[in-house]
Amino acid sequence: MSKPIVAMVGRPNVGKSTLFNKLAGKRISIVQDTPGVTRDRVYAESEWLNRKFTMIDTGGIEPESSDIIVKQMRRQAQIAIEMADVIVFVVDGKEGLTAADQEVAQMLRKSKKPVVLVVNKIDRLALEENSYEFYNLGIGDPITISASQGLGLGDMLDEVVKYFNDPSEDEEDDEYIRIAMIGKPNVGKSSLINRLLGEERVIVSNVPGTTRDSIDSYLETEDGKFILVDTAGLRRKSKVKEEIERYSVIRTYAAIEKADVAILVIDAEQGITEQDEKIIGYAHEMNKAIMVVVNKWDLIEKDDKTLSNYQKDLQQKLKFMPYAKYLFISALTGQRVHKILSTAKYCYDNYSKRVSTGLLNDVISKAVLMKEPPVVALKRLKIYYATQVATKPPKFVFFVNDPNLLHFSYGRYLENQLRESFDFDGTGIEIEYRARKE
């Protein structure tokens, strides 16, 4: 089940980043060194009242003029409207209501998306009356907070989670495998989706997707029920490349967050780029099921070793996710396109797999017998037992004497044992080590 997305919108210097970091707490961390993935704090996981959600800070670079500020805020608001389940609109209680605030409020009102209006920098009771003028925005009662002091955050979060769907309401979509087609523009993502829809000749309905430019295509085939999401995004030109790049990353992240299977589509002639590595790195960090589809394979001159060598080169560049599945196709000619959905279903089945506790502990016991944990600081890791606590992705908890005694190479060894024993091919898995007394 994907987590709700909460997007923060507001002018520069109203305290969005302070609020973002306060809510994220210690949850933002570098889990591992994944090549090509920048930790620019675009997103963070958070939780309130046992509801987990993803926060996205839409703020980009700091503009220099008021005209640019308004343009940037329009973009922020548009992105939030496109992809968020709930929008948090942050305004400055000390500076007061501005024309830019009013313009963005108008966009948010028209969107019909849930909006929580937050008046920041109200750090003492005497400033409460500063919030009254924000009623003029017409988007509900303002909630006063001080992000820097942590005041009022509980009231704000209570309001945010009110708008989340009850998990049971999402059960209908749960029978569909949600696939995000990700990758740079012009690699053939849309052509590929059209080819899949055109070839299958089945029940297809189009419903508005998470982004204004994309349509979620519902598709039923002999391989299963699928939702195909094209992450094309906006194609507006901008003088500020960094800003557009950030917004592109935010959009793609949101699509991956809501997906079961992430399919990175690359152009066979261009090969894989740093941007591709960054994009698929997000899916890897979230432990999604992952496929790499090399499109336009018909344009490559080949001999009997071309495909094998090309795949080895890709696997070397993407060695941080050795479990990914690879396909070489042509959306234009239809070559191997029929294998995409069956491979996605295979990856999804592994992503959804549950392992019995008995079998799991047998495998772990044998793995430890074959290779003992190394000694760390004169002590050795002891694994008491393990259990699977979740699927989509598969998550395991290992109860041990001291998690600090786990050497990363031994952790990798145990993960490989799980993968080989239970066939977690094509999907990320998560292993957590918890301390337990003997």
From Swiss-Prot:
<feature type="domain" description="EngA-type G 2">
    <location>
        <begin position="177"/>
        <end position="352"/>
    </location>
</feature>
<dbReference type="InterPro" id="IPR006073">
    <property type="entry name" value="GTP-bd"/>
</dbReference>
<dbReference type="InterPro" id="IPR031166">
    <property type="entry name" value="G_ENGA"/>
</dbReference>
<dbReference type="InterPro" id="IPR003593">
    <property type="entry name" value="AAA+_ATPase"/>
</dbReference>
<dbReference type="InterPro" id="IPR005225">
    <property type="entry name" value="Small_GTP-bd"/>
</dbReference>
<feature type="binding site">
    <location>
        <begin position="10"/>
        <end position="17"/>
    </location>
    <ligand>
        <name>GTP 1</name>
    </ligand>
</feature>
<keyword id="KW-0342">GTP-binding</keyword>
<dbReference type="InterPro" id="IPR032859">
    <property type="entry name" value="KH_dom-like"/>
</dbReference>
<feature type="binding site">
    <location>
        <begin position="183"/>
        <end position="190"/>
    </location>
    <ligand>
        <name>GTP 2</name>
    </ligand>
</feature>
<keyword id="KW-0677">Repeat</keyword>
<feature type="binding site">
    <location>
        <begin position="120"/>
        <end position="123"/>
    </location>
    <ligand>
        <name>GTP 1</name>
    </ligand>
</feature>
<dbReference type="InterPro" id="IPR027417">
    <property type="entry name" value="P-loop_NTPase"/>
</dbReference>
<dbReference type="GO" id="GO:0016887">
    <property type="term" value="F:ATP hydrolysis activity"/>
</dbReference>
<dbReference type="Pfam" id="PF01926">
    <property type="entry name" value="MMR_HSR1"/>
</dbReference>
<comment type="function">
    <text>GTPase that plays an essential role in the late steps of ribosome biogenesis.</text>
</comment>
<dbReference type="InterPro" id="IPR016484">
    <property type="entry name" value="GTPase_Der"/>
</dbReference>
<keyword id="KW-0547">Nucleotide-binding</keyword>
<dbReference type="GO" id="GO:0043022">
    <property type="term" value="F:ribosome binding"/>
</dbReference>
<dbReference type="Pfam" id="PF14714">
    <property type="entry name" value="KH_dom-like"/>
</dbReference>
<dbReference type="InterPro" id="IPR015946">
    <property type="entry name" value="KH_dom-like_a/b"/>
</dbReference>
<comment type="subunit">
    <text>Associates with the 50S ribosomal subunit.</text>
</comment>
<dbReference type="GO" id="GO:0005525">
    <property type="term" value="F:GTP binding"/>
</dbReference>
<feature type="domain" description="EngA-type G 1">
    <location>
        <begin position="4"/>
        <end position="168"/>
    </location>
</feature>
<comment type="similarity">
    <text>Belongs to the TRAFAC class TrmE-Era-EngA-EngB-Septin-like GTPase superfamily. EngA (Der) GTPase family.</text>
</comment>
<dbReference type="GO" id="GO:0042254">
    <property type="term" value="P:ribosome biogenesis"/>
</dbReference>
<keyword id="KW-0690">Ribosome biogenesis</keyword>
<feature type="domain" description="KH-like">
    <location>
        <begin position="353"/>
        <end position="437"/>
    </location>
</feature>
<feature type="binding site">
    <location>
        <begin position="57"/>
        <end position="61"/>
    </location>
    <ligand>
        <name>GTP 1</name>
    </ligand>
</feature>
<feature type="binding site">
    <location>
        <begin position="230"/>
        <end position="234"/>
    </location>
    <ligand>
        <name>GTP 2</name>
    </ligand>
</feature>
<protein>
    <recommendedName>
        <fullName>GTPase Der</fullName>
    </recommendedName>
</protein>
<feature type="binding site">
    <location>
        <begin position="295"/>
        <end position="298"/>
    </location>
    <ligand>
        <name>GTP 2</name>
    </ligand>
</feature>
